[in-house]
A protein has these predicted regions:
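N-terminal donor/sugar-recognition subdomains of glycan-related enzymes
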Residues: 1-258, 267-270
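Acidic, glycine-rich loop-and-beta core segments that form the ion-binding/anion-interacting portion
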Residues: 263-264
């Protein structure tokens, strides 16, 4: 464990994701996982279950070589977009970044906040955290994926993506990651269908837009809602990490306020 790694990682995390920083900064790190030195030198990770049985997460011999060999089977050089399922000590992501460009998108999903807190103490993650294409999601509710993935929906749907799994971690949280992957696949499949539909009917869409243009221009828009609910507070709710953080507060206050939701946030709020 080195304080310099932790300090550097927290500084990087605070710059790129203040919400995740606030979630992690007070955690001390998981006691279910053990970090030791591999025979080749870099740290390795193992898991101790409730019966005291040890399970290796990364190779005890050479975790870097293990990650490299696995990624070769995925032909990552053919991919621009990556979904990393299970972070661990980050060896797979470090190898992806070696050949990544500024256009590469790497979305990382880790279930265990305490494991992530432990990893920040053991490995310098600054190169991962500060890569412009990296987004890191820790203990994210799969129901909120719409908002989290929306900014890259078209990119991932058109250019596809490579799923990279830290299998030993996925196996430890199988129910969570199975649901997560199912929701991700469903989300991007729907996006592909929508893009195909738009392509087929694009002329009709533009025809309808121009046909309705006068009505758009004459519509009072949101001004028509002015003073509709005097003395009743209203909240406009978007999707994303902030919704994940505040949804319980919104649910407990629903009878005291008027909630306006974007489409991607509606389902989780119902």
């Amino acid at each position: 464990m080195t304080d310099s790694f932790l300090s550097r990682n927290l500084d990087s995390l605070k710059k790129v994701d203040i919400a995740l920083f606030n979630k992690i900064v007070s955690l001390k790190g998981s006691t279910e996982y053990v970090v030791t030195r591999s025979k080749s030198g870099p740290p390795t990770l193992s898991y101790m279950d409730s019966r005291g049985k040890k399970k290796q997460i990364h190779s005890n011999y050479d975790p870097v070589l293990e990650a490299t060999r696995y990624l070769k089977t995925l032909n990552i050089e053919e991919s621009l977009n990556f979904l990393v399922i299970g972070l661990g000590l980050g060896y797979q992501v470090f190898e992806i970044i070696k050949s990544a460009t500024s256009q590469t998108k790497i979305y990382i999903f880790e279930k265990d906040p305490e494991l992530f807190a432990l990893a920040l103490r053991e490995v310098d993650f600054s190169i991962i955290l500060e890569h412009p294409g990296v987004r890191l999601f820790v203990d994210t509710d799969p129901r909120f994926l719409d908002g989290l993935l929306e900014s890259e929906q078209t990119n991932f749907a058109l250019n596809n993506y490579c799923v990279v799994k830290q299998k030993s971690l996925v196996d430890e949280n199988l129910n969570y990651f199975d649901v997560l992957l199912e929701e991700i696949e469903k989300y991007f499949n729907e996006a592909k269908i929508n893009l195909k539909t738009q392509s087929i009917h694009s002329k009709l869409y533009y025809k309808n837009i121009f046909s309705n243009l006068n009505d758009f221009l004459q519509s009072p828009g949101i001004k028509s809602l002015r003073n509709c609910l005097p003395d009743i507070p209203a909240i406009v709710c978007s999707a994303g990490p902030s919704l994940d953080t505040n949804i319980q507060l919104l649910n407990t206050s629903r009878k005291r306020l008027f909630l306006i939701s974007v489409g991607t946030a509606l389902k989780p709020l119902l």
